[in-house]
Curated annotation (Swiss-Prot):
Homotetramer (in vitro). Heterotetramer with HSD17B8; contains two molecules each of HSD17B8 and CBR4. SUPFAM superfamilies: NAD(P)-binding Rossmann-fold domains. It is found in: Mitochondrion matrix. This is Carbonyl reductase family member 4. NADP(+) binds at residues 11-14, 34-35, 55, 82-84, 147, 151, 180-182. Its EC number is 1.-.-.-, 1.1.1.-.
């Protein structure tokens, strides 16, 4: 029987690549985005099964989203949290509303989706969660103090949750990408940054998706942070 996977932030970038790979592996995939039309377009393009809209900063929308997935596809086996935003600025120039948005979407939203997903996973005595972090959470970066805090907070949350639910046969892991060629990195000077990366190039979303799939399916890995950065951390 095909496993059911919910991919938050699954309409673009890394999340879309994950959803596409899971659909190719014959999983039942729900693509969740804040924009329903964008989610529907992604589902049509990649051959997923269900498109839903959800603002992860709103708990009631998360609850409704999981109910829709269960009603249409069944109990969720895999959860991937790839929804996220960036608002790069030096801390002294960062607006208070941007601080709250970054933490609300990148960290609290993931915490809330995990909390709701766990109810079903505990009932079925098993499940796997992969949260998308960032190398910035590990190493820090100028102009990304709040973004980095949200991603490092995600790592601490995931490791603690992994300890809480391991006895329930539920695994929780993190993939921490470096520079990946997506909309979020389109304004970066790729040629100069490539010099910092031992492998000499930005990664592709599909390469991160392979790492996500590996952690979702690995039955004896939990509480792990898998860095996918072409060796960038060796230079930071």
């Amino acid at each position: 029987m095909s496993k059911v996977c919910a991919v938050f932030g699954g309409s673009r970038g890394i999340g879309k690549a994950v959803a596409k790979l899971l659909a190719q592996k014959d999983y039942k995939v729900a693509v969740i985005s804040r924009n329903l039309e964008v989610a529907q377009a992604a589902v049509t393009e990649i051959g997923a099964h269900l498109a839903l809209s959800c603002d992860v900063s709103k708990e009631n929308e998360i609850q409704c989203t999981f109910k829709e997935i269960k009603n249409n596809l069944g109990n969720i086996d895999y959860l991937v949290n790839s929804a996220g935003i960036s608002r790069d600025a030096l801390l002294l120039r960062t607006r208070s509303e941007d601080i709250m948005s970054l933490l609300s979407i990148n960290l609290v939203g993931t915490i809330q989706t995990c909390k709701v997903a766990l109810k079903g996973m505990i009932q079925q005595q098993g499940g796997s969660i992969v949260n998308i972090g960032s190398i910035v959470g590990h190493k820090g970066n100028i102009g990304q103090s709040i973004y980095g805090a949200s991603k490092e907070g995600l790592i601490g949350f995931s490791k603690s949750l992994a300890k809480e639910v391991a006895k329930r046969n539920i695994r929780v892991n993190v993939v921490a990408p470096g520079f990946i060629r997506t909309d979020m990195t389109s304004d970066l000077k790729e040629d100069s940054l490539n010099k910092m990366i031992p492998l000499g190039r930005f990664g592709e979303p599909e390469e991160v998706a392979q790492s996500v799939l590996f952690l979702l399916e690995s039955p004896y890995i939990t509480g792990h942070v898998l860095v996918v950065d072409g060796g960038l951390q060796l230079h930071l």
